[in-house]
Amino acid sequence: MLGQETAVLLLLCVGLLLLMAAVTNGAGFSLDGIKGRTVGDGQHGTARFAGKGEIRRTFHRVRFRPRAWRRGKHLPKVQGLVVGCEMRGKRVTALVDSDDIHAMMVAGSGAGKTAYFLYPNLEYCCAAGMSFLTSDTKGDLARNYAGIAKDIYGYDVSVLDLRNPVCSDGNNLLDLVNKYMDAYMAHPDDLASRARAEKYAKIIAKTVVTSSSGTEHGQNSYFYDAAEGLITSVILLVAEFCPPETRHIVSVFKLIQDLLSPSGQKGKNQLQMLLSLLPPEHKARWFAGAAITAGEQAMASVLSTAMASLNAFLDSELEQMLCFSTKIDAEKFCREKSAVFVVLPEEDSSKYFMVSLLVQQMYREILVVADGQGGALKNRVMFFLDELGSLPKIESLELMFSAARSRRLSIVGIIQSYGQLERNYGKEGCSIILDNAQDTIAGGFSPAGDTAEQVSRQLGEQTVMTGSVSRGKSDPSRSLQMMGRRLMTPDELKSMPKGQFIVMKTGRRPMLSKLRLFLDWGITFAEPYVLEQHAQREVKYAGSKELRRKIVKEYGIPPGQQIVPGQERFPERQKPGMIQENV
């Protein structure tokens, strides 16, 4: 009896062992048993996301408390860019990159660039005392944050509203040319001021011509280059000889139009006669040399190109912003807490070039201020360039990304795809800009775009396990190999939820960053900031007659040249559409 029970138990044990072996064997030789886990020693790549310890060593963790900040309490001492956050209940901790960096944010439409990224960063800028400039296509940033910055944080706020210029603060494009020309006229030995005036005149002319015609001119490049020189020349003449109230960009257009008329001397127009009154070494004469020495037809083409480029300024509303004093002062912007909001009209991209021009002028003036402070600003300055890919080409943007970082100027470019940058700056220019952006923040990928593929490639590959299973009648087998796999495939990137971004930083592992809606950060808005409509102001324009008198008074009449009788007179009746001059 005992022997039978023992035999039964032995049979049961053997059966269980056989069953376990069968199950184990079936799992081992199933494709589901081959897991794509990280293996090996990085033979096909070592990409991985940063761990919690690495994130804490890379970024500053700052308690985000806007309610206390707005009461002047617990203000953050670390200046930098907010790239992520951690939440425990209602407690929000911001991850701040405090290094001298530039950043490029790549996110499609509807990714939450404003509500998830810009609002927290503007709040942090205000609390940390950083001056900032931001472009704003919807007007939301100025509407919601200009009042907070001014009334709560004590910022000097300027709003350049290109959508509604009659409510905008002033922005005379010739302001810096006038400033340095006045300095030179007061001290004729100050050649540095004269050189700066000429430099800013060239920047204005190039930006104006490029914005209206693009960068590819082909066989017509002579006419556009000559038009740039002519506009530069007239800008310098306006700055040097015209009354202060007429020194603006619209006067440049009017003078070119006036100087097209015949001079009374066969074969020469008013422009040629006017420039001949200048000394041979005067730079205004040199800049216009390509235009005034050309044949009659070529010169007419150059003049028409110059006037066509300036047509964007012929707007009665826009004149109220362009023809009076400028509120923005670069030195004050760097030394005191200041905020500049540039509101762009979504329905009219022809005015976008003014942002490009403002960025160039501000950048160069910031370099001058930084040089006076030992090479670097004492207070960090931030440029948030939303829709950078939609703005006309910013000349020397590659140089800005290369050099501005060490001056404590951080540029945060926001684009919808890399293709936008490549369109404006070419393949090499785009590569230089991206190589000099120490932080890349990517998310909100379009299902049909190729940006996700580019970001996936940038993240690199990791080494994972793969294999195969073969089954015979009696001897199933399994083989395992190592292969490279993208850290995140394009499909995985495209399926990321709203508010989740990839943050890649130079010299660090990439990070999966979660940015919350501004309400979750504890951000609330006060009453919308509204600029009052200015009373219509009379615009005064420079006149060629007065300009000629000033030149003759300054330099006299050149030997062998006479003022042709009647040359100083103008028709009593102007042609329809011409601007009445103020003399």
Regions found by a protein language model. Give the residues of each.
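Basic- and hydrophobic-enriched, low-structure N-terminal and domain-boundary segments
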Residues: 1-111, 115-123, 128, 166, ...
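Short intrinsically disordered, low-complexity coil segments enriched in acidic
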Residues: 2-6, 454-458, 508
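Short, exposed beta-strand "edge-strand" segments with a Pro/Gly-rich flavor and a Y/T-containing core
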Residues: 29-63, 89-90, 241-254, 314, ...
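P-loop NTPase motor domains
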Residues: 75-90, 94-409, 424-427, 491-512, ...
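Conserved ATP-driven motor cores of ASCE-family P-loop NTPases powering translocation/secretion/packaging/pilus
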Residues: 401-502
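Short, surface-exposed polybasic-aromatic patches that bind anionic ligands, especially phosphate groups
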Residues: 516
